[in-house]
Amino acid sequence: MNQVDATRKRPPGIVKRWGWRILAILQAALLILVGLAAVAVASRYGGRWLPFLLAGAAGWVLAQVLKAGLSLPLAANPATAAAMVSSVWFPVFAAVLPALAEELGKYVPLRWMRVQAREQALALGLGAGAIEAVFLALPLLLNPVAGTTTLVGMLISVWERSWAVTLHAGMATLDGFAACARRGRWLLAAMAAHFLADLPAGQYQRLVALRAPGVVTWLVIAEILVPLLALAALALGRGLWRKAGAAPGPAQ
């Protein structure tokens, strides 16, 4: 998922001196919570979760490779990059590419591994969300200057990552149901949820690059919409799996 960057300005005081450390600690705490959630799944459902957790992380990495292969040739050309950002269609492009690549990055391993339970899909989603959080937090650990931020920016970052992991888990339950029941419309539903989650972030990034008004409005929309989509995806996925049983068969 796209990251909304609310960490632009370095203020004086304790946040100036310790901001990157605090944010790194909060990011680490978030990863610990994800790990505890995985342990909770493991304690209830045995070792069946671990391959899916690892597959989720691997699928996310492969999705980033695919995204880079498609977008870097355009971004590497300054003229093309400037034209893309200035276009009103930039948010759509910035949302469509992650939605397609990352949801296929969940669906393909779920289909290949023959997912049979919602908890397996949840584990895969947690793996994808956790590795994404690691990649976004890594620059803070390697380059403290890159992590300087305001206290509000730190809280927004942790809020966003928490709900992004939750959304990954929710979308994975839809992908898993689509893979298990051979009902592709739920894969499309997961892609649609991912697209809607990234669309405001793309518009936010565009307005920041253009120094145009409306930045705060789109930031607020992004931070509200992601939790709503995460809760909706989790509820829908749970309902689908519960209605069909633990291992729904292919549609006739």
Where are these regions (language model features)?
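Hydrophobic alpha-helical segments at protein termini of multi-pass membrane proteins
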Residues: N2-Q252
